UniProtKB/Swiss-Prot annotation:
The chain crosses the membrane at residues 184-204, 220-240, 262-282, 309-329, 344-364, 373-393. Belongs to the major facilitator superfamily. Proton-dependent oligopeptide transporter (POT/PTR) (TC 2.A.17) family. The keyword Zinc does not apply. The lineage of its organism: Eukaryota, Fungi, Dikarya, Ascomycota, Pezizomycotina. It is a multi-pass membrane protein. Its main location: membrane. Induction: Expression is down-regulated by ralstonins, lipopeptides produced by the plant pathogenic bacteria Ralstonia solanacearum. Expression is positively regulated by the imizoquins cluster-specific transcription regulator imqK. Peptide transporter; part of the gene cluster that mediates the biosynthesis of imizoquins A to D, tripeptide-derived alkaloids that serve a protective role against oxidative stress that are essential for normal germination. It comes from Aspergillus flavus (strain ATCC 200026 / FGSC A1120 / IAM 13836 / NRRL 3357 / JCM 12722 / SRRC 167). This is Peptide transporter imqD. It is found in: Membrane. GO terms for molecular function: transmembrane transporter activity. InterPro entries: MFS_trans_sf, POT_fam. The gene is imqD. Keywords: Membrane, Transmembrane, Transmembrane helix. Residues 1-25 are annotated as: Disordered.
């Protein structure tokens, strides 16, 4: 999703200039020109469809995990599988192990075939941009950082002129490359603020599913309720892109990258606060109050607390808006700030932040049970709000730097 550009005074001419999205980060642009979206190429839609298929597979596998981690109280299937007729448990286990290894072998061979085809396809498609090999850029980047560390953590110490003057040494990089590393490090610092954001975002695929299981679902599987998150992302995305951002630009409101991410953090805090409120309502409602599905009135886990599951809807709406403001902007920010040959590396660090967020989620697992869930959501809401404040204080200066760069 393309982020809104800085608002500027309208051009005296009425001509509309379309900016190619692939050139925005590398070509000097007249700030008085209006900013409009370029047409998305068909190849991009193909890649988007493939990515959607991958996400379908990912969530199709991971979402049921929560149900296995916390099976219904009355479920016998979650505990054992009875053999049919005279089959023995040993036979079923042997077949199961064979199926596992056979499936893994099929996956390996299918993946190997797909890789071979993906190497051949670009040779016959003129739409692929083929770049000449430039070698591994990581050793050069490591050398720049090493020089900066020896120079008291100042990147200026890695400049060719500094190395030549102080060490009579010629280096293999230029000032442009050092400045690219400087911008890439800015993106890496911003990623640190997203660790707790990813912890909160992961609640949609675990604890919020369990929360739905404690409510009246009217026959809808509780793991299906979490589908409201991607639904609202799809709905709110165009609303924000086509409605909010142009409106802010029209009124000369500078809603830049750092501002959008900080706003998304506050929205994420609000979604966790609302989830805490929903959990409080569940605990205040019978038949089991703060012990859902476990009291005698639940009839062995069959009767949840009498709260409508669609009370969760605002949680997913706010969470979707937070995801659009913060996560989408992070992807854009890391891509535009990263050095030309290190974009994939810097964006991969975003996934490292997600891994750290998951580690925090594991650490707070002792709170993820009744009747402590309300305090877990409240703690996440407060912590996320504090992160938003600190994030804004530390990184708001980069808004001004971005305006100067543009």
């Amino acid at each position: 999703m393309t982020a809104p550009a800085d608002s500027t005074e309208k051009s005296e001419t009425s001509e509309t200039t379309t900016l190619q999205t692939t050139e925005v980060s590398t070509v000097d642009v007249d700030p008085d020109l209006p900013r409009v979206l370029a047409k998305v190429p068909g190849t991009v839609w193909v890649v988007a469809f493939i990515a959607a298929a991958e996400r379908f597979t990912y969530w199709g596998i991971t979402t049921p995990w929560q149900l296995h981690a916390k099976p219904p109280q009355a479920s016998e299937f979650a505990r054992c599988i009875r053999p049919r007729r005279s089959e023995s448990i040993h036979d079923i286990q042997c077949l199961h192990v064979f199926l596992l290894f056979n499936t893994n072998s099929f996956r390996d061979n299918l993946g190997r075939l797909s890789r071979s085809l993906s190497d051949i396809a670009p040779e016959f498609d003129k739409r692929f941009r083929k770049l000449p090999p430039t070698g591994n850029i990581l050793p050069k980047a490591g050398s720049v950082l090493s020089c900066a560390i020896r120079g008291r953590f100042q990147l200026d110490a890695a400049m060719p002129s500094y190395q030549r003057e102080h060490f009579a040494k010629e280096v293999s990089w230029d000032e442009t490359f050092v400045n690219e590393i400087r911008r890439g490090l800015v993106a890496c610092r911003v990623i640190l603020g997203f660790i707790l954001f990813f912890t909160c975002l992961s609640q949609a695929s675990n604890n919020l599913i369990s929360q739905a299981g404690q409510m009246k679902t009217y026959g809808i599987p509780n793991d299906t309720i979490t589908a409201m998150n991607p639904i609202f992302c799809v709905i709110m995305g165009p609303v924000i892109q086509k409605g909010l951002y142009p409106l802010l630009n029209k009124n000369n409101v500078k809603f830049q990258s750092i501002t959008r991410m900080a706003t998304g953090f506050i929205m994420m805090s609000a979604s966790m606060a609302f989830a805490a409120g929903v959990q409080k309502i569940i605990y205040d409602t019978g038949p089991c109050y703060d012990r859902p599905l476990t009291c005698p009135g639940a009839e062995n886990g069959r009767i949840p607390n009498q709260v409508n599951v669609f009370l969760q809807t605002p949680t997913y709406i706010i969470l979707a808006v937070a995801e659009i403001f913060s996560f989408v902007t992070l992807s854009e920010y890391t891509y535009t700030k990263a050095p030309t040959d290190m974009k994939a590396v810097v964006q991969a660090l975003g996934q490292l932040g997600a891994a750290a967020g998951s580690a925090i989620g594991i650490a707070i697992t002792p709170l993820a049970h009744d009747p402590s869930l309300i305090w877990m959501y409240t703690g996440l809401a407060v912590a996320m709000f504090l992160v938003a404040v600190v994030f804004w204080i530390l990184f708001k200066k980069y808004n001004a730097i971005d305006r100067e760069d543009k």
